[in-house]
Amino acid sequence: AIVEQQGAPXGLGRIINKXK
């Protein structure tokens, strides 16, 4: 979730947060 909060480009947030 931290990556998504930082606004990481691409879909890194999704990869790290499979949960979502």
From Swiss-Prot:
Keyword terms: Hydrolase, Protease, Secreted, Serine protease
Region (Disordered): 1-20
Family: Belongs to the peptidase S8 family.
One BP annotation, GO: proteolysis
Cysteines paired by S-S bonds: none
UniProt lineage: Eukaryota, Fungi, Dikarya, Ascomycota, Pezizomycotina
GO molecular function, one term: serine-type peptidase activity
Location of the protein in the cell: Secreted
Enzyme class: hydrolase
Described purpose of this protein according to its UniProt entry: Capable of breaching the insect cuticle.
EC number annotated for this UniProt entry: 3.4.21.-
Annotated GO CC locations: extracellular region
Name listed for the protein in its UniProt record: Cuticle-degrading protease-like protein
